Amino acid sequence: NAIPGNYYRWPYAKVPYVID
C-alpha cells in the first residue's frame, strides 16, 4: 500500500516510508 518515494498514508499519515 505504499509507493517508493512517496509517503505512507495508511495506516499512518504523512510518514516518510519506502515500502513495497
Swiss-Prot record:
GO biological process terms, alphabetically, are:
proteolysis
User: EC top class, in one word?
Assistant: hydrolase
Q: What is its EC number?
A: 3.4.24.-
Q: Which residues form the Peptidase M12A domain?
A: 1-20
Checking InterPro entries in the record gives: Peptidase_M12A
Cofactor(s) listed: Zn(2+)
GO MF: metal ion binding; metalloendopeptidase activity
What keyword terms does UniProt attach to this protein? Hydrolase, Metal-binding, Metalloprotease, Protease, Zinc
Question: What's its job?
Answer: Active against casein. Has a role as a digestive enzyme.
* Protein name stated in the entry: Astacin-like peptidase p18
Q: Which organism is it from?
A: Argiope aurantia (Black-and-yellow garden spider)
